Structures are given as C-alpha cells and as structure tokens.
Amino acid sequence: GGLNIPWVKFAKSKEFWPLMVAHFTWNYFSYGLWAWLPSFLSSALNVSLAKSSFLSILPYLSTVAVTTLVAPIADSLENKGILSRTDVRKMSQTLCFGGGAVALSTVGFIVSRTPPASVANTTIVMVMSALAFCFGMGAWVRTGLFCGHQDLSPKYASIMLGVTNTAAAIGSLLSTFFIGYFITIS
C-alpha cells in the first residue's frame, strides 16, 4: 500500500501555516540577499566587482561558524529544561529574523549617511561586519524553521518540507525580481 498523505489535515493545521509563512519569508529574505549582495557592494559602497565578489564570501563564513554552534546551544537549552522545544524553536526563529532585521537596519543606517563616492575602508568594514552578523544570525533558522516539520509530524516531515519549500521558492523568485526592479527604478 501507498502512503496516505493527510493533505486536508495539513491545510487545516494551525501549526502548518505559520511554518509555511516562515519558510516563504526566510527564502524571500535570504535569497534576495544572496542574489544582490555583490551588486549592493558595488553600487552602494563603490567596491569593484572583483573585490565585492571576495567580500561577498565573508558573511557566508559567518554562517558556517555560527551554524556549528546553534544546534548544541538549542539542544542544551531543551535538554536542561531551560526552554521547551516550542520555546527553543521560537527563540531560534526570533534570533534569525530579529538579528537579520537589526543588522540590515544597521547597514541601511550606515549606507544612508555615506555617499558612494566617499566610502572609506571603515565604512566597508562596518557594513561587512553588520552583514556577517546578519548571515550568522540566519544560521538559527536551522534550529527554528527547519526543525518545525519534524516536530509537527515525523512521518510526514519530508512531505511538509516539500510543500513549504515550494511556497518558499516563490518567495525566492519574488525577492530577486522585486529587488532588481527597485534597484532599476531608483
């Protein structure tokens, strides 16, 4: 016999829809950043494309470093009874989205006060530090959003991830399009 997938239960689940929204939002945010980071560094900070390609790697290194820490921290908080599993997921996703929002607001603040023609190395260092913080905080998605499917239904986690990932792919497409559009008209 085949696997009887409870599609109607997914659609009616009050826990499933926030997971889908979080996944859509994560992809909208992250793929927009990933796609346009070299262009941003070139246009906003007057950095050559060759140098901006190198600088674009730095935030990813932050993600790799922080990723090695988030699971042990999240597991420790749950295993020691400091936070429930649900609270660990909420904390993780809050750190992911909240950290990104603070970091990108900081980047916007720095860039808005510095005309591209007069960008100093200190400005580049400040912006890259904020972006590294942003990408590092994004690592918390691994103990937030990406554990939610398994928490809701271990048996159907892969199917639920496929559904939310499909919606999230639309977010990726929209963000890269709209960011490009707004850059073109501004």
Question: What is each PLM-predicted segment?
Answer:
Residues 1-5:
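Flexible cytoplasmic inter-helical loops of multi-pass small-molecule transporters
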Residues 11-71, 108, 138-150, 172-176:
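Extracytoplasmic gate region of multi-pass secondary transporters
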Residues 44-62, 88-90, 125-129, 159-162:
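Loop-to-transmembrane helix entry
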Residues 67-68, 154-185:
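A late C-terminal transmembrane helix in Major Facilitator Superfamily
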Residues 86-144:
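C-terminal transmembrane helical hairpin of 12-TM major facilitator-type secondary transporters
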